């Protein structure tokens, strides 16, 4: 029986990837469709992707597929043929190719079956995920963004919004997508007659969010086709002015793609303009935060002096300290509350409703 999962250590796989000289293409895609046998589909796709040397993260569920991967450039056409043939619903599925790509975005293939391809927390049998808002192409986005009767709503997490967003976009301040959905409904309760434009990184979250808004009585709901990635690609191809400012956060080793030259965020340690995310080098913390080169050198890649000092302890002592902490600390290493407490960042003066 073939092995349908990875058995090599992350360290060895990462070293192999960094030693590669062949160019790779980073690409993401998603599709909502009914998948009757997710396990069999997963195993077949895994076998195909392994043969093609695909790395990345892929989730499949009864509601479809969500993938962020890197493909050897010389096998990209083979990859497309295999993907398009894997299920009728995936024939000619839209592929979002990365803008800034050194080919080092992933080093292992992880293909998992999940309950949902995006965790939404929706538990309502009357909700119809197929009833979605209208797609907007890049030129339509630019036409609508200055309309006073149109609201652009960012359906990403706080750390994504912080480094880049559409001009005048509304942030739904939360740590997770499942928290955002009811929050967005509450925040926009008095704007049901306006045009509501949802957007996210590649389209998967804002597509479901558009269906959720329609389900909750909003009338004129839109979402950016292909998300920020596709918008930026099309805007540049067509010579359109970019209405997205800053960097697009991505969930791989790159942690971001520059869309415009604007740097709208600041180092969480010294306050200098900076939009480079990193994880604290202390594995017992692993906090996601923004750090400039000066502070990276000063704190040795750590988020604080406490973590910097802990990192210098013997390995056994570090392991002992990690074991004594709550198991959830790594799970919630992107929490805004944890970030504010660790970095001593004050909470915004205005509430979400006031904003």
Swiss-Prot record:
SUPFAM superfamilies: Rhodanese/Cell cycle control phosphatase
EC number: 1.14.-.-
Pfam family, one: UPF0176_N
Gene Ontology MF term list: oxidoreductase activity, acting on paired donors, with incorporation or reduction of molecular oxygen
Span list, region Disordered: 333-355
Keywords in alphabetical order: Oxidoreductase, tRNA processing
Catalytic activity: uridine(34) in tRNA + AH2 + O2 = 5-hydroxyuridine(34) in tRNA + A + H2O
Positions of the catalytic residues: 200 (cysteine persulfide intermediate)
GO BP annotations, alphabetical order: tRNA modification
Segments forming domain Rhodanese: 146-240
Keyword Nuclease set for record: no
HAMAP family assigned to the protein according to its UniProt record, in alphabetical order: TrhO
Main function: Catalyzes oxygen-dependent 5-hydroxyuridine (ho5U) modification at position 34 in tRNAs.
Protein name: tRNA uridine(34) hydroxylase
Organism of this sequence: Yersinia pestis
Lineage, top ranks: Bacteria, Pseudomonadati, Pseudomonadota, Gammaproteobacteria, Enterobacterales
């Amino acid at each position: 029986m073939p092995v349908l999962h990875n058995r090599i250590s992350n360290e060895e796989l990462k070293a192999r990837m960094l030693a590669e000289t062949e160019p790779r293409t980073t690409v993401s895609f998603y599709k909502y469709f009914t998948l009757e046998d997710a396990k069999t589909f997963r195993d077949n796709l895994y076998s195909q992707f392994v043969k093609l040397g695909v790395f990345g993260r892929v989730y499949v569920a009864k509601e479809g597929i969500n993938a962020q991967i890197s493909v050897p450039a010389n096998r990209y056409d083979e990859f497309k043929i295999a993907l398009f043939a894997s299920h009728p619903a995936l024939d000619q599925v839209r592929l979002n190719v990365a803008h800034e790509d050194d080919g080092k975005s992933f080093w292992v293939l992880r293909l998992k079956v999940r309950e949902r391809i995006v965790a939404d927390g929706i538990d309502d049998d009357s909700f119809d995920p197929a009833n979605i808002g209208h797609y907007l192409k890049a030129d339509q986005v630019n036409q609508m963004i200055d309309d006073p009767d149109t609201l652009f709503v960012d359906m990403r997490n706080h750390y994504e919004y912080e480094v880049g967003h559409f001009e005048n976009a509304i942030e739904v301040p939360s740590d997770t997508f499942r928290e955002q959905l009811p929050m967005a409904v509450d925040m926009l309760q008095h704007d049901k007659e306006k045009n509501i434009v949802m957007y996210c990184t590649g389209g998967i979250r804002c597509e479901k969010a558009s269906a959720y808004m329609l389900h909750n009585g909003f009338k004129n709901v839109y979402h950016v086709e292909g998300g920020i990635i596709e918008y930026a690609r099309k805007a540049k191809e067509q010579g359109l002015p970019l209405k997205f400012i800053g960097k697009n956060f991505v969930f791989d080793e790159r942690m971001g793609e520059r869309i415009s030259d604007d740097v709208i965020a600041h180092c969480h340690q010294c306050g200098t303009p900076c939009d480079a995310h990193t994880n604290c080098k202390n594995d017992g913390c692993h906090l996601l935060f923004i750090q400039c080169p000066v502070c990276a050198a000063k704190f040795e890649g750590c988020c604080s002096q406490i973590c910097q000092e802990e990192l210098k302890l013997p390995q056994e002592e570090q392991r002992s300290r990690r074991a004594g902490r709550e198991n959830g600390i790594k799970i919630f290493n992107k929490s805004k509350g944890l970030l504010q407490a660790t970095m001593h960042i004050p909470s915004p003066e205005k509430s979400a409703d006031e904003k």
